[in-house]
Amino acid sequence: MNAADAAYDADLLVIGGGSGGVRAARMAAARGARVVLAEAGGMAGLGGTCVNVGCIPKKLYSYAAHYAESFEESHGFGWHGNAPRLDWGRLKENRRNELARLNGVYLKLLV
């Protein structure tokens, strides 16, 4: 028998590993249900759209953008010197690292 022909015995199939899917799976499992969670991955993996391509990446980029205004406004408060330059590659790398960390948090919630 190959994996495609295998029979699965579960009480609940949760489709999607976003916040709601992970919560539903955990709540059911805590009550003794045998749970299978199906997550296709792709753009929105564990944690769902908000964590992977929506809310969290947007907030990270928005937060980074506000620093430019803060550096500019700091001159009026006695700060001197040139504002640092944005390293776009590093910002993207840090975003990827934070999303990987959050995906790991969701994975730990399931095991």
Which residues make up each language-model segment?
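A generic local structural motif
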Residues: 1-2, 22
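Glycine-rich flavin
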Residues: 2-3, 8-9, 27-33, 37-111
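Glycine-rich Rossmann-fold phosphate-binding loop(s) that bind the pyrophosphate
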Residues: 16-19, 40
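Residue-level detector of alpha-helix initiation sites
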Residues: 18-22, 45
